UniProtKB/Swiss-Prot annotation:
One of its GO terms (cellular component) is hemoglobin complex. Involved in oxygen transport from the lung to the various peripheral tissues. One of its GO terms (biological process) is cellular oxidant detoxification. Belongs to the globin family. This is Hemoglobin subunit alpha-A. Coiled coil: none annotated. It comes from the Eukaryota. It comes from Gallus gallus (Chicken).
Length: 142
C-alpha cells in the first residue's frame, strides 16, 4: 500500500502525540490484543500477562518504539524494520495475521487517547501505515 504525501504527514502528526506514551500505549495495545484475541498469548508463555505487568509494559514500549522509528523513517520502513522482520520471521515465527490484529488494537488505543486527532483522514492514513508495517514484517516469510 502506497502512502501519499498527505498520509505521511498525517502519520507523522499523530506520532508526535504518541511518542511520549510508548510504554503506556504499548501495554494497552498488548493487553487489548491478548484479551480480544487470546491465541496471540501463545507467543508469550514466559510473560506475566496480568494487567500492568512489567513484562507487558516493557514489550509494549518496544513495539511502539518500533512504530515510532518506522514513522520517523516513513520513506524507508523496510530498511528501518529489517532486523525486526528477520527476528519475527526466522526466530520467533510469529503468525503473520498477528501483525494485523496488533495494528487494529493499536488503532483503538490511539482512538481512545486522541479522539479529536484521529479524524477519518488520519485514521485512514494510520491504518495504511500499519498495513505497510505489517507487510514489511511479513515480507521475509516468503
Amino acid at each position: 500500500m502506497v502512502l501519499s504525501a498527505a498520509d505521511k504527514n498525517n502519520v507523522k502528526g499523530i506520532f508526535t502525540k504518541i511518542a511520549g506514551h510508548a510504554e503506556e500505549y504499548g501495554a494497552e495495545t498488548l493487553e487489548r490484543m491478548f484479551t480480544t484475541y487470546p491465541p496471540t498469548k501463545t507467543y508469550f508463555p514466559h510473560f506475566d500477562l496480568s494487567h500492568g505487568s512489567a513484562q507487558i509494559k516493557g514489550h509494549g514500549k518496544k513495539v511502539v518504539a518500533a512504530l515510532i522509528e518506522a514513522a520517523n523513517h516513513i520513506d524507508d520502513i523496510a530498511g528501518t524494520l529489517s532486523k525486526l522482520s528477520d527476528l519475527h520471521a526466522h526466530k520467533l515465527r510469529v503468525d503473520p495475521v498477528n501483525f494485523k490484529l496488533l495494528g487494529q488494537c493499536f488503532l483503538v488505543v490511539v482512538a481512545i487517547h486522541h479522539p479529536a486527532a484521529l479524524t477519518p483522514e488520519v485514521h485512514a492514513s494510520l491504518d495504511k501505515f500499519l498495513c505497510a508495517v505489517g507487510t514489511v514484517l511479513t515480507a521475509k516469510y516468503r
